[in-house]
Swiss-Prot record:
Keywords recorded for this protein, A-Z: Cytoplasm, Glycolysis, Lyase, Magnesium, Metal-binding, Secreted
Active site: 205 (proton donor), 335 (proton acceptor)
Organism: Kineococcus radiotolerans (strain ATCC BAA-149 / DSM 14245 / SRS30216)
Residues binding (2R)-2-phosphoglycerate: 163, 335, 364-365, 386
Binding site for Mg(2+): 242, 283, 310
Major subcellular location class: cytoplasm
Purpose of the protein: Catalyzes the reversible conversion of 2-phosphoglycerate (2-PG) into phosphoenolpyruvate (PEP). It is essential for the degradation of carbohydrates via glycolysis.
Primary gene name: eno
Protein name: Enolase
Pfam family membership, one: Enolase_C
Length: 431
């Protein structure tokens, strides 16, 4: 048994220059571990609450000194002496100490930082890599990297409404090869943008953020870039979207490409995209509160591709269960800071998988060098990970960790590839 001896925390900066929480845990056997908490730009209304200081004279009110103090003054003392391997008990102690349904008293950023740091310390004490400690002996599937190479929406200051245009190297034989294919396509896209006289500035997640006339223009540019690499559009490299529709949804519908649109119209628009492009996944095609619309689009498109709930489910078992009951969506995005603890995240993933929902592990737009989600993707067998473009070190850190995991697994490693998207089997793509 390795017990918790000390818990510390500090305020650090994330990839957008905003403060976030970093937690350190020391065990009685000398084991030490550290974890940092990410933060989102487009956040769902039903996410667990971050604790921010609100002092406009310091970091524009985004400081996290109060969350740091909560870790040091309340959470740490409550956990000292607990067995670090009892993750569920440790998380329960913190949830009870917080006492709110949204973790608003201590802050989800405080609780999650401790939860992840404890898990990493326990894995180290057990002399196991984190993916093996969390996933057991059967953790061996490397995820498809869903690379966000064109940024729009809340991740870029342009006229493109859809937030993320992703490539998925489904035809690769290994994660290592998939990463190369993605990086080569990324660089090919930069060349295409330069040739067109378009901006090659980067959005929050490392993707390019050109100002384009329409969302289809972004897809066309990516298809052109894939063609320049020599890879086959669809069978080698498929496409995916994160629409983040909640960001442009109001009381009178969806404000999309200059017009007010209904959920039915949006569904028809996506049906057109699916028929024209090799799309394997659409995330948040409709708003987080548009349950009727989600039922409609799932009925129309759920048999053809993955419909991912991010803002809809917020990695919350209760929200996910509602989606399961209503047949709204067929996949869940997994963001550890949406729910705010490791065990609650694992419970949500388990519920999804038991009910035939796929899962996609995900970063946030405000990231750090922490690589926990890479291990977590392999541990739970998500088969997909979304952690940005193959650029910016806070994104690449996760990809590099997956390279290490694949190397460690050696012959036991299996790359998910096209099998991660069974609903899209047989699509032909567009030449």
């Amino acid at each position: 048994m390795a017990t918790i001896e000390a818990v510390g925390a500090r305020e650090i900066l994330d990839s957008r220059g905003n403060p976030t929480v970093e937690v350190e845990v020391l065990l009685d056997d000398g084991t030490f571990a550290r974890a940092a908490v990410p933060s989102g730009a487009s956040t769902g209304a039903y996410e667990a609450n971050e604790r921010r200081d609100g002092d406009k004279g310091r970091y524009g009110g985004k400081g996290v000194e109060q969350a740091v103090e909560a870790v040091i003054e309340e959470v740490g003392p409550a956990l000292v002496g607990h067995d670090a391997h009892e993750q569920r008990i440790i998380d329960r102690v913190m949830l009870d100490l917080d006492g709110t349904p949204t973790k608003s008293r201590l802050g989800a950023n405080a609780i999650l930082g401790v939860s992840l740091a404890v898990a990493k310390a326990a894995a180290s004490a057990a002399d196991l890599p984190l993916f093996r400690y969390l996933g057991g002996p059967n953790a061996h599937v490397l995820p498809v990297p869903m690379m966000n190479i064109v940024n729009g929406g809340a991740h870029a200051d342009t006229g493109v409404a859809i937030q993320e245009f992703m490539i998925a190297p489904v035809g690769a034989a290994s994660f290592r090869e998939a990463l190369r294919w993605g990086a080569e396509t990324y660089h090919a896209l930069k060349s295409v943008l330069k040739q067109r006289g378009l901006a090659t500035g980067l959005g929050d997640e490392g993707g390019f953020a050109p100002d384009l006339p329409s969302n289809k223009d972004a897809l066309d540019l990516i298809v052109e870039a894939i063609g320049k690499t020599g890879f086959a559009v669809g069978s080698d490299i498929a496409l995916a979207l994160d629409v983040a529709a909640t960001e442009f949804h109001g009381a009178d519908g969806y404000d999309f490409e200059g017009s007010k649109r209904s959920a039915e119209w949006m569904t028809g628009y996506y049906e057109g995209l699916v028929s024209e492009y090799p799309l394997v996944s659409i995330e948040d095609p409709l708003s987080e509160d548009d349950w009727d619309g989600w039922q409609h689009i799932t009925n129309a498109l759920g048999g053809k591709l993955q419909l991912v709930g991010d803002d809809l489910f917020v990695t919350n078992p209760e929200r996910l269960q509602k989606g399961i009951d209503l047949s709204a969506g067929n996949s869940m995005l997994v963001k550890v800071n949406q729910i705010g603890s490791l065990t609650e995240t694992l419970d949500a993933v388990d519920l999804a998988h038991r009910n035939g929902f796929s899962t996609m592990m995900s970063h946030r737009s405000g990231e750090t060098e922490d690589t926990t989600i890479a291990d977590l993707a392999v541990a739970v067998g998500s088969g997909q990970i979304k952690t940005g473009a193959p650029a910016r070190s806070e994104r690449v850190a996760k990809y590099n960790q997956l390279l290490r995991i694949e190397e460690e697994l050696d012959d036991a490693a299996v790359y998910a590839g096209a099998k991660a998207f069974p609903r899209s089997a047989g699509f032909t793509g567009r030449a």
